[in-house]
Amino acid sequence: MKKLIILLSVALYACSSSDENPNPIQVDEDNNPPVSQSFTSFLTGKSTDLVTSPDGGVCLMGGSTENDQAMKWFLERANGGDVLVLRATGGDGYNSYFFSELGVTLNSVETIVVKNAEASTEDYIHQKIKNAEAIWFAGGDQWDYISYWRNTPIATLINDAISNRNIVIGGTSAGMAIQGGYYFSAKNGTVTSSTALNNPYDTDVTVESDDFIKNEFLSNVITDTHYDNPDRKGRQVTFMARVLKDSGVQIKGIACDENTAICIDDNGIASVYGQYPDYDDNAYFIQVNPELITVEPENCAPNTPLTWNLDGNAISVYHIKGTEDGNATFDLNDWTTGTGGTWENWYVDNGALID
């Protein structure tokens, strides 16, 4: 009888413990997050959440090596809070870089590597997004991010964090490519400028605008990255021509070279960071020439080279060299006011971009 009472007591205790917290989210004694088949997580810093008031903004980075000054700008806007790194490949390379190498005090840096679309339902990831003051998207393949997260709770929570908690957000390479309201999805793989310019309707020219990441100053923008390796001016101009031809919408373009970053504050002022004049680091703010009445491409059709000439004035571009101090700026409120850059006209003639 005594053994029976003990067994019943143990069973009742186990049941009551489970009922109180059926899905506990916690780290183990070594500060490691739970193991999951759909994601892997790496935590540096404190496992307890620290609530701060982030300053908002967006950091767009063109790929290759990160620009330290732009990364400091990004991290400082978390105001000592928690930074979440989301990626579909790779490991914890950002953790120590963010947490201890840039001189910015943070509560934690956690990298979550998602392995499949099933991760979008994971409560652990949901909670980490809710706790983050900053979210950074690593490079990789943007189609992974789009196919895993678009129209899922993860996208909803990220957008809620942007609009309601004013978190700072950003990404490099593929992580930059998904930040605009329009985006090259790479659903069928990448596409070169030559291919796009010579056939704007090639199956690899996959421009989409279904709701994904909603950044206030990028709702009518398509971004592009690695602009100098290889040259991607032609394909981005083709993306813009396609949208104009197919839907009548005059979208704008933002792009930067590798090792270059564009930091947009919550007032819509974009600052460009790079290492010019030591290196030729460039950023571009591209729009249909606002002074023209007729703006559509002369020839944008399947299996035909693009012509978007309009007497050499089709596209208006504000070109900035990125510097360590990020002093050159462009105003995304009016797409007219800039400091430290130069205006250029680009156009396309029979599949050849002239810039």
What residues fall within each predicted segment?
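ATP/NTP phosphate-donor binding region
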Residues: 66-127
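C-terminal and late-domain segments of enzyme folds
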Residues: 28-80, 90, 95, 190-355
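Sec-dependent N-terminal signal peptides
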Residues: 4-12
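Catalytic nucleophile loop
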Residues: 136-139, 162-183
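Glycine/threonine-rich flexible loop motifs
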Residues: 142-152
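Bacterial Sec-dependent N-terminal signal peptides
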Residues: 12-37
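Catalytic-core regions built around general acid/base machinery
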Residues: 128, 151-165
